[in-house]
Amino acid sequence: MRIRTLPTLAPLTLAVQAFMLAGSLSLSAGASAATAAAPSTRNVTWEDIANDHLTTKDVLQYGMGTNAQRWSPLAQVNDQNVFKLTPAWSYSFGDEKQRGQESQAIVSDGVVYVTGSYSRVFALDAKTGKRLWTYNHRLPDNIRPCCDVVNRGAAIYGDKIYFGTLDARLIALDKNTGKVVWNKKFGDHSAGYTMTGAPVLIKDKTSGKVLLIHGSSGDEFGVVGQLFARDPDTGEEVWMRPFVEGHMGRLNGKDSTPTGDVKAPSWPDDKTTETGKVEAWSHGGGAPWQSASFDAESNTIIVGAGNPGPWNTWARTSKDGNPHDFDSLYTSGQVGVDPSTGEVKWFYQHTPNDAWDFSGNNELVLFDYKGKDGKVVKATGHADRNGFFYVVDRNNGKLQNAFPFVDNITWASHIDLKTGRPVENEGQRPAKPLPGETKGKPVEVSPPFLGGKNWNPMAYSQDTGLFYIPGNQWKEEYWTEEVNYKKGSAYLGMGFRIKRMYDDHVGTLRAMDPSTGKLVWEHKEQLPLWAGVLATKGNLVFTGTGDGFFKAFDAKTGKELWKFQTGSGIVSPPITWEQDGEQYIGVTVGYGGAVPLWGGDMAELTKPVAQGGSFWVFKIPSWDNKSAQR
């Protein structure tokens, strides 16, 4: 097989060379004003969204379907002809607002809707890249994003586009004009509430109502994480569920039930406070900042809960107590939620009393798991920041399998399949500072808080039965610090410096068998991997790299088949769709995110990477389209 590649070039030079290769490259520059010229007129129905994982002409939901598998049945572009893939068009987001571009685009009725950094939305003609309209949200100065000014995507339903903002709003736009239909504030942005994840649509089987589901961000600033359900037509809240034990939920505008036990025994008592609980309980995190999956069969929303606040394990443990006695529910795990009421149906915790900021927000992929006994279980697949891959029964939250997907995990030896709990290694929870000192003794931990895999979503292939996991091999020095809550300030109580594990690589794209935990193949990258993954029926796996390459691999062997230099690092999930008989593949480009802000030695490693902001679309040239058919 032949590999087509381009050298590292400045973006303008790259665009010119790509034009010569493709013969059809359309470069479009963005503008800030909305323009009404969208060709999209057909409204999106729930049936469209429910079948998103089966259909090919649109991409309507984050994860490319409610199951979040990121697998496409398209095979026009395949392992035999992918070397012919060339740019169809590229759109520049424009102006100085670059930073991390982590958005997964959606596609409907010939229009690409892609969000950008600083809470922006662009509507583009899917065939030409022509700008149809732009929405620029006006952000206040006192926003508190923890991990860059990113936005991970939008949702679509009816005649509206929905997305969240860094000042804690959910906004509905007319999908044809970009004009605001409604705008709902859900939290105090000056206290750290933001929204970076893409909202999703689900249909409650009990009521028959379609609901718009979204979470909040802000664990690093001491928020209490909340999951919301809204009426997609009006934006009105239907219910809200907090993910810290003992905090009160809402249903139809009124207090409903507390999450778990109202006495919150998994958080220590403190008779000196107004609440009777330790300070951390009032600022306990658990924010579901990533997008939810939806199991229509069991009528369950399944979403990850974020890390507890603060990171410091001793702030969430009674004085002279044992952290293992205080699990900090309902944080750092996966939650099954009833869409009718917002009640918690089940909860599985990946990291009890999480001392390492492992969180639980990484995507939850719905798939059929076949165990060693041959029994098939409707399950979730989850590659956690803590370095372990989990298979959980999505009907009841019971653990089915767990195994490491990265090397040299130090904090735990394994996950006990009987108890479902990690078997921790001694000395990996950093000790309190000694009397008179402000900082505890550093401990070397792996994975570091940025995780064996972070938010960037993996893919599952229905053909190979493998998960394709974009992970990182690294470690950190980690130590405790004194911590007290102050509104709008970081609420961590930990210090850190991320370091290399290996000299020749950090990122690893790994294909793994969920039944056996076996590593089938891996591809190594010098820089951290922060892009998502796409798998297709064409025996292909696509992902992007920190140094700007968009790559395709053989799904069975891991052989690199094609790559293209986009001019800036890629930290987003790719998508694919079919239009007028041709397969298109798109990816958002622009380096940033958490690594250059929080990454220690890794931030130094990525300094040479250029920033950017653009959306690239690839296809096999139309004149060669016949040879692209299998």
Label each region the model flagged.
Residues 59-63, 98-120, 145-169, 194-220, ...:
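Repeat-blade elements of multi-bladed beta-propeller folds
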Residues 68-187, 536:
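N-terminal cofactor/phosphate-binding cores enriched in small/glycine residues
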Residues 471-473, 501-559:
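Loop/turn-rich, solvent-exposed surfaces of beta-rich toroidal or solenoidal domains
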